[in-house]
Amino acid sequence: MKVFPATTAAVLICSHLAMAQAPEVWTFDRLDAIGGHPTTVLGSPRLIDTPLGKAVEFNGVDSALVVDVHPLAGAATFTWEAIFRPDGGEQAQRWLHLQETGTENRMLFELRNVDNQWYFDSFVYSGTSSKALIDPKRLHPQGAWYHVAAVYDGREFRNYVNGVQEGAAEIHFDPQRAGRTSVGVRMNLVNYFKGAIRIARFTRRALSPAEFLPLPTR
């Protein structure tokens, strides 16, 4: 049995904790894999060039990606971010859906379209708790790039568009177990998304807006 000096053990513990806290980044710069995870391609999503770099564009009809990973499984606190471009289409769209295997526990980024504008909907269902943060008065023009985020600190659930808080609620969410992610559609293949996604980031702690991904400037 190896015996490590106290300093070595401390370094190993700190390294393990740092790895556990490291965010998972999904850059949408290819179709066959995202964040190192293989994808199942549904319909005809397209890889496109944008001022922000490569992105995946979805047609709002039948295109989506499915990843056999729930990137926030086990997280008691979290920050979930994305940079995306909504391009109109159907009124209700579910564009990023994390689902625990074998249960109804899930986390969604959704949007609603109204007269060439959209508003954000962040939803979590976990254990005996569920909450949608949605404000129809918070309208944003379609066709531009946006940063959106949902943050849970173990007590309060908040959401943001371009770093500005739009909703908040005190609630308890149980950590979710392993599962899958659908991108561009709800997991049961309804409410397809029309637009493009550049990046998503999943962090296992509550970030402040100052720590968010940089806002899109083009």
Regions found by a protein language model. Give the residues of each.
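Bacterial N-terminal signal peptides that target proteins for export
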Residues: 1-8
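N-terminal signal peptide c-region/cleavage motif recognized by signal peptidases
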Residues: 14-17
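Extracellular glycan-recognition modules
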Residues: 22-38, 47-49, 61-121, 156-157, ...
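Beta-strand-rich interaction surfaces with strong enrichment in secreted/lumenal proteins
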Residues: 67-70, 134-139, 170-172
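Short, aromatic/His-centered strand-loop micro-motif at the edge of beta-sheets
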Residues: 121-147
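Localized edge beta-strand/strand-to-loop motifs within extracellular or lumenal beta-rich domains
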Residues: 144-158
